[in-house]
Design a protein with these regions (language model features):
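Anionic-ligand binding patches
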Residues: 5-191
């Protein structure tokens, strides 16, 4: 459940080959407007979004469908985990250049993306966490991806930012990819 087409495409690319059908939830032709709580952790944000989505689908054709939500954040070591669960707000307000300004002169550029994917299915809630370690780059670089991808260099990316990776390369090492694959294993996907 998201209005972010990039997240829908990424989930589709990761879960469809595993036998899952991924569709963006539309109620009355509209993406549900979920309130993003300001919480201390991405787990709480994902659970809140999932609870809202389940409530919105009660009494609709989607009431018995599996619902997937994902929340993620960028956690920068030298900034005590900032922006963390406030990543969307920080991206919208100070953007990539603002984060790079906060990191100006900083030698400890370690960071990680964390994601939580949560599914409501047949009355059960299943969740999985994914982490991708790396560093914050010195400059904005790359044309692919979204969010903080142009300033995050995963450890496994040979010096390239997430925004310089193909969608396939990114999905094999990304926090979201790990979280989504973890949920798929919990769901025991249908046979192909």
């Amino acid at each position: 459940v998201t209005g972010n087409q990039n997240k829908v495409a990424e989930a589709h690319g990761i879960l469809s080959p595993l036998g899952f059908v991924i569709e963006q939830l539309l109620i009355g032709g509209q993406v549900p407007d979920l309130i993003e709580p300001q919480a201390e952790g991405i787990e709480e944000v994902a659970k809140s979004k999932l609870d809202q989505a389940v409530s919105l689908t009660m009494g609709t054709e989607f009431e018995n469908e599996a619902l997937l939500v994902e929340d993620s954040g960028l956690f920068i070591d030298s900034l005590s985990g900032f922006p963390g669960p406030y990543s969307s707000f920080v991206h919208e307000t100070i953007g990539l250049s603002g984060v790079l300004s906060l990191m100006s002169g900083e030698t400890d550029r370690g960071a990680e993306f964390r994601a939580v994917a949560a599914v409501s299915f047949q009355g059960n809630i299943l969740s999985s966490t994914g982490i991708c370690r790396g560093v914050i780059s010195e400059n904005i670089s790359g044309d692919f991806g979204f969010g903080f991808d142009p300033i995050f260099i995963p450890d496994e990316a040979n010096g390239r930012t997430c925004a310089q990776l193909s969608s396939h390369e990114k999905s094999t090492i990304s926090h979201r990819g790990f979280a989504l694959k973890g949920v798929s294993e919990l769901l025991n996907p249908p046979s192909k």
